[in-house]
């Protein structure tokens, strides 16, 4: 990731987690730290003055889990991990790296990962008129039940999802 960024070859990034199936898991369900590190590389490059135009794409195909619920989970997780990576203290981290204080540098990095940013993300959503709890809002909207009924005939021979 860092090599692609610094080679100015990163055009986009596909989000999914596919350890046990092809694109069937929501982002970060297996290794959220990996996604955090990817976002950290993007933030680091931008902090270094690189102008990135990254296309973020979600590449998932859920067969057992509801597609809408999984998409909302993925977007919410991506928002949280992106914010965590944005909160890394790059100045402190650079100073520790320069002094070769590897353990302390890693703790700065890990400290940002372990921050509970859900209240900040909720505040950001509320300020934009978005549901503070998007998954709850989706489930309470009745949309999933409605679309499931509308599409029931189309998936007579298919998997466990409604779309």
Regions found by a protein language model. Give the residues of each.
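Histidine-acidic metal/acid-base catalytic patches
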Residues: 1-163
């Amino acid at each position: 990731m860092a090599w692609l960024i610094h080679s100015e070859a990163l055009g986009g990034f596909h989000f999914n987690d596919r350890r046990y199936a092809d694109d069937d898991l929501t982002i970060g369900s297996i290794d959220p730290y990996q996604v955090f590190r990817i976002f950290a590389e993007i933030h680091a490059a931008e902090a270094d003055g690189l102008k990135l135009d990254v296309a973020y794409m979600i590449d998932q195909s859920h067969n057992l889990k509801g597609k809408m619920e999984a998409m909302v989970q993925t977007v919410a997780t991506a928002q949280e991990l992106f914010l965590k990576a944005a909160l890394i203290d790059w100045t402190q981290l650079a100073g520790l790296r320069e002094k070769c204080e590897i353990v302390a540098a890693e703790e700065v990095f890990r400290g940002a990962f372990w921050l509970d940013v859900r209240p900040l993300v909720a505040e950001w959503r509320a300020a934009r008129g978005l549901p503070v709890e998007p998954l709850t809002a989706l489930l309470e909207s009745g949309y999933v039940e409605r679309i499931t009924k509308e599409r029931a005939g189309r998936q007579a021979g298919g998997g466990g999802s409604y779309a």
